[in-house]
């Protein structure tokens, strides 16, 4: 069941080295549309996180996309072993050989992805947001100032979460992503920064 609430928020980040958990809006803020995210291969749904175990919409998505394995991870200082090391590794810019699929069941955090000009776009994921980052997409994750997220991780087949830290421009999966999503002649959405 689609949940009615404000849509996913995303914006271009400033270059500040301040706490990674801050929003890092540019001044003035420069928001990014869902269409721009889709042009980068980022897919998004808003689902009923309170009823995720019986949600028919989630079942349809899982069936259609072949997500046959799930687990739930809680990221917060009290629940995640080696918390500081994990947060640091999540925030290292990296790619995966497969999609990264996360469904926020509670809490919130940020996924950052690169645009075609290598600028960071920050995506604020909140309760009910399900997001898919395509294989080969440079990205990173951090908690926001609430320091808490509970997320369902979804996989096709065996659960594999192997990050390949940047630079990976010669990796075949990265090349495939660039060819599919970042070739200027293939972009049908204006990716220019808008005020």
Curated annotation (Swiss-Prot):
EC category name: oxidoreductase
Please name the pathway: Amino-acid biosynthesis; L-methionine biosynthesis via salvage pathway; L-methionine from S-methyl-5-thio-alpha-D-ribose 1-phosphate: step 5/6
What the record notes about the co-factor is: Binds either 1 Fe or Ni cation per monomer. Iron-binding promotes an acireductone dioxygenase reaction producing 2-keto-4-methylthiobutyrate, while nickel-binding promotes an acireductone dioxygenase reaction producing 3-(methylsulfanyl)propanoate.
The residues that the entry says bind Ni(2+) are 94, 96, 100, 139
Family annotation (Pfam families): ARD
Q: Per UniProt, where does Fe(2+) bind?
A: 94, 96, 100, 139
Co-factor requirement: Fe(2+); Ni(2+)
> Which GO MF term does the entry hold, naming one?
iron ion binding
Q: Which domain of life is it from?
A: Eukaryota
Q: What does this protein do?
A: Catalyzes 2 different reactions between oxygen and the acireductone 1,2-dihydroxy-3-keto-5-methylthiopentene (DHK-MTPene) depending upon the metal bound in the active site. Fe-containing acireductone dioxygenase (Fe-ARD) produces formate and 2-keto-4-methylthiobutyrate (KMTB), the alpha-ketoacid precursor of methionine in the methionine recycle pathway. Ni-containing acireductone dioxygenase (Ni-ARD) produces methylthiopropionate, carbon monoxide and formate, and does not lie on the methionine recycle pathway.
- Please state what the protein is called: Acireductone dioxygenase 2
Organism expressing this protein natively: Physcomitrium patens (Spreading-leaved earth moss)
